Amino acid sequence: MKKYFLVIDQGTTSSRIVLYNKKFEIFDIVQKEFKQYFPNEGWVEHNATEIWDDVRNLISKIFRKNKLNSKNIISIGITNQRETTVLWNKKTGKPVYRAIVWQDRRAVEYCNKLIKQKKETLIYNKTGLLIDAYFSATKIKWIIDNVPKAKQLIKQKRLLFGTVDCFLLWRLTGGTNHFTDATNASRTMLFNISTNKWDK
C-alpha cells in the first residue's frame, strides 16, 4: 500500500491539500479559493465554516482522485495564516463571528489604549511581540466586547479560541483536540515565550 504525508495549507486566500510521498516529493495538489469579506474600511474577515468545509471537501477530492483512504496517510500537517482568529461554540463547533484575519485593523484603538497604559514593555517581555492589531489577542477582545453570543458562551464555559490550525484540528478530530503549537501560539500576544505556556 502506498503511503503519503497529507498537508493542509490554509492560506489567506485559498485552502490547499498537498500529498507528499515518502521521499517528500509532491505527489498531488488540490486547491480552492474562498471569499474575503471587507465589512468596513480596514476590516478583513473569513468564514471559518466555509474554510472547514473547503478543507474537508478538498481532502475527499484528493482521496477520490488518487483512490486513497485514511490508511494511506502516514501523518497530517497543517500550515496556516497564524494570527487569524476564530472563536467558536465548543458544543456545536459553530463560530460566534467570522474569523478576523491577520490584516484586519479594527483593534488599533484598543492597542493605542494599551500603549497609553504603558503595557508595551510588559507585553514585549512576555510575548516577544509589540502591541499591534495584527496579533490575535486584540481581535479576541474585540469579539468578546462586540458579539453578545461570545459573552454568553463565556458565562457557560463553552467558548473556544484558536488560530485557524487549532479550529481545523478541533473539527478534524470531532471536537476532541483543542491544541495548537508554539509557533502559532507565539503569534497571539497571549503566549509567554520564556515559559512556553499561555500567560495569565
Tell me the role of every PLM-derived stretch:
Residues Q10-T12, I123-K200:
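Gly/Ser/Thr-rich active-site cleft segment
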Residues D104:
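Carbohydrate-associated surface elements
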Residues K90-K94, Q117-T127, I143:
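Acidic/polar active-site rim loop that often engages polyanionic ligands
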Residues R64-K71, T92, K118-E120, P148-L159:
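Short, glycine- and charge-enriched coil/turn segments that flank and shape catalytic ligand pockets
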Residues T49, D53-S60, R64, N112, ...:
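A broad, structural surface signal
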